From Swiss-Prot:
NCBIfam families: murE (TIGR01085), PRK00139.1-4 (NF001126). It comes from Prochlorococcus marinus (strain SARG / CCMP1375 / SS120). This is UDP-N-acetylmuramoyl-L-alanyl-D-glutamate--2,6-diaminopimelate ligase. GO terms for molecular function: ATP binding; magnesium ion binding; UDP-N-acetylmuramoylalanyl-D-glutamate-2,6-diaminopimelate ligase activity. Meso-2,6-diaminopimelate binds at R396, D420, N421, P422, R423, G471, E475. It is found in: Cytoplasm.
């Protein structure tokens, strides 16, 4: 892929005098370490370092030109002879827009659905991908676990990639024949303009609960970042569709700001603040084997059966079905496909070992709301005791730590407090931050070593008991200081279950 530099600038509305209008670029990157000869470098301001200060390194490595922000230009001013272009912030906006033009605006060539929210993004996107496959729609998935499209699958590095990579991925998916794409979009990605240049045909709001306040500083700022997905320029046009969870107070507020193309979703048929949901469920029967009921939409209703565990997963299912109906898929075609969806790795994933053993599940729940939903869901799973093994991540929102402790002690019969990804924080201090939330009468074990903590909980549990290992889910690593080690809750739990069965 090649593009004339002056034409690229012109296409996004940047008017600059460029000496040598025949300059050609063949790639776009925001990583000065990996910029290739003939590439266009974007220096993005970061939380710790402004990437714009590396423009000299990028040019020395063969970049045709560099695009940087005003602060970087003040720190290391380029001369008139340097092929450096200073743009207004956010620089990431211009990178996304130019990368989109460079790759021939790939998101405009498919139906692209964005899914945002604190919890439920991964399950909702996986459901959409599954339902597309069952309906014969060639799709692409971009998210926390994997990025995949026909004949391609790769482990994701970020929930949402930066614009230089994201637009390339979209172009590859389009070239591979994808007709519909579904993308997890984090609040960081929206705030940092990683999805600039994307054109979404639809958007889904799952919920908004406390998380990332170390980054956003307030729930209002967190909400405003999420809301960016539901307005121009990200939503394609006024007729672009959306599905919003109005059981969530932030979702209810968002729905009032949107047009008639927004479908409001609720788990019950009820009027909420004068709003009647377009999507809702009735006749629910929730058991430890799954859920069944009747799904209602503006295009009819019908029965469904799902193997997903927990009431909270119903909203993920309802919104996935709703957004696909809005994209022209028949409700009657979608309903039978719900039953065959087996779930997402690390999301209420049961560790299966044959024998007279406790039930052990691994879940990614790492927020107060996520942990509460998981524990409440497991109460219907059996009549035995409920064990909870959890910790809190280091270098992240500290205010949620005592809240997590309070929820664990309220909804579990036994709590094992341990490390999550401590990162550069003192693991003991993280546990100390959690402890004020845990009631004094709680049956509690404190064990910093996560593997030992998992073993202690499983060994203490009896057949008929349930052990929830929360926080890390699908992750196959643990971050200790600046080191990342191999660590998988699922593998450790399986090993301990075998040990318990054959001591």
């Amino acid at each position: 892929m090649n593009y004339q530099l002056h034409e690229l600038f012109k296409a996004v509305g940047i008017h600059r005098q460029i000496v040598g209008k025949d300059l050609i670029i063949d790639s776009i990157s925001c990583d000065s370490r990996h910029i290739s000869k003939g590439g266009l470098f974007f220096g993005l301001p970061g939380e710790k370092v402004d990437g714009g200060i590396f423009w000299r390194k990028a040019l020395a490595s063969g970049a045709v030109a560099a695009v940087i922000g005003e602060e970087a230009a003040q720190k290391d001013p380029p001369s008139n002879e340097d092929m450096v272009f200073v743009v207004s912030d956010p620089v990431a906006h211009w990178m996304g827009e130019m990368a989109s033009v460079f790759w021939k605006r790939p998101s405009s060539q498919i139906d692209l659905i964005g899914v945002t929210g604190t919890n439920g993004k991964t399950t909702t996107t996986y459901l959409i991908e599954h339902l597309c496959k069952q309906s014969g729609i060639t799709s692409a998935l971009f998210g926390t676990l994997y990025n995949r499209w026909p004949k391609h699958s790769e482990v994701a590095i970020h929930t949402t990639a930066f614009g230089d990579v994201l637009q390339s991925q979209l172009a590859q998916a389009v070239a591979a024949g994808a007709r519909l794409g579904v993308m997890e979009i984090s609040s960081h990605a929206l705030d940092q303009r990683r999805v600039a240049g994307c054109s979404f045909s639809g958007a889904v709001f799952t919920n908004l609960t406390q998380d990332h306040l170390d980054y956003h500083e307030s729930m209002e700022a967190y909400f405003q970042s999420k809301a960016l997905l539901f307005q121009a320029p990200l939503l394609r046009d006024k007729e672009s569709c959306s599905v919003v969870n109005i059981d969530d107070p932030w979702g209810l507020r968002l729905s009032k700001q949107l047009n008639k193309s927004c479908w409001r979703a609720s788990l019950e048929k009820r009027v909420i603040d004068s709003i009647q949901p377009e999507l809702f469920l009735t006749d629910l029967n929730i058991t430890n084997k799954g859920i069944e009921g009747v799904l209602h939409s503006p295009f009819g209703q019908g029965p469904f059966v799902s193997s997903l565990i927990g009431r909270f997963n119903l909203m993920n299912m309802l919104e996935a079905v709703g957004i696909l109906i809005q994209h022209g898929v028949s409700l009657q075609e979608l309903l039978p496909s719900i039953k065959s969806f087996s779930g997402v790795p690390g999301r209420m994933e049961q560790i299966k070992v044959e024998g007279d053993l406790p039930v052990v599940l691994v879940d990614y729940a790492h927020t107060p709301d996520g942990l509460k939903n998981a524990l409440i869901a497991l109460r219907s799973f059996g009549s035995g005791r409920l064990f909870c093994v959890f910790g809190c991540g280091g270098d992240r929102d500290r205010s949620k730590r005592p809240l997590m402790g309070a929820i664990a002690s309220k909804f579990a019969d036994h709590v094992t407090l341990t490390s999550d990804n401590p990162r550069t924080e003192d693991p003991q201090q993280i546990l100390n931050d959690v402890l004020p939330g845990i009631a004094t009468e709680t049956e509690l074990i404190i064990e910093i070593d996560r593997a030992n903590a998992i073993q202690m909980a499983i060994m203490k549990a009896l057949p008929g008991d349930i052990v929830l290992i929360a926080g890390k889910g699908h992750e196959n690593y643990q971050i200790l200081g600046l080191e990342t080690i191999e660590f998988d809750d699922r593998e450790i739990a399986k090993k301990i279950l075998h040990l318990k069965l054959n001591p």
